[in-house]
Amino acid sequence: MSTDITALQHQALVYDSLDEYVVRAAAFLREGLEHGDGAVVAHTRAGIAVMREALGADADAVRFVDVGEAYTRPAHTLAAYHDVYADQLHRTPSLRAVADVQFGPDPGEWDLWTAYEAVFNESFAHLPARVLCTYDGSRLPERILDAVWRTHPTVLTEDGARTSDCYEEPDQVLRRIATPSAPLPQLRSIGFGRDAEEFRERLAREMNLAGTPAGRSLDMLLAATEVAANAVTHGGGIRDVRAGSAGGRFACEIVDAGPGFDDPLAGYLAPRAGSGSGLWIARQLTWSLEFFHGPRGFTAQILL
């Protein structure tokens, strides 16, 4: 019989040593396996090797995910876990997952991964899953460790599971960490053109001038087309398009002639029946997608 998991239980563990991680993660997974839960482990290749050895014969029942491949950009990571969890839940009624969280060395990217952890609560709320996010407390800075308590309803301590009194709802986290957005001055206006085909031609020309690799150019073309379609279908049409290189990334800004919207979760949640998938796709294909009210109107800023 599977454990009584009917909705997401998003927990965190801050460990001080690899030995502590292995002991607690293995016990967490084995308890689930004994009750018929599916099992997932996400870690570095070295971490996966250690967990395989620790689990012994039980490792055959576990799905292993290389975080080096999964943790590329936040929305892509959400989509990757959606696929992994869905596959497991086709086989078992509920699952347990251990994911070693990788924030990366660049402090400028930490807020993006904090947003990912916050959105995780909403994105997977409906799944019968107990997910344990693990953090190496011996090397992570205080800023990230503080975010652990703000993005996980429950944190496992030496004294057992503790409800976080610092926990914030996903939209609260995203609003709190959001930096004031503004049009990028490096970009130039290229306009939308007569139709979507001309829009893509203009954008492709700018990316060619910027030396953007062909594969990534296609990602931007697909993402920008989805964002533009959203502005036409749900907004007030397109007032302007600006594009160019900024801060080492290619950027595209699409200015909506309508009033815009106020939803920090837009594009982070997987589409369900009756909802569109355009912004979800755009977030997966690009590094970031931000919306703000700029001098010329409501603006979608896409960074590749």
Functional labels for PLM-detected ranges:
Residues 183-186, 218-235, 264-269:
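Coiled-coil dimerization/phosphotransfer module
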Residues 32, 207, 231:
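Hydrophobic pocket-lining residues that define ligand/cofactor binding sites across diverse proteins
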Residues 197-226:
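Conserved short strand/loop->alpha-helix "switch" segment adjacent to the catalytic nucleotide/phosphoryl-transfer site
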Residues 232-304:
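Conserved beta-strand-loop-beta-strand hairpin that lines the nucleotide-binding pocket
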Residues 1-196:
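Non-catalytic sensory/regulatory segments that transmit input signals in bacterial signaling proteins
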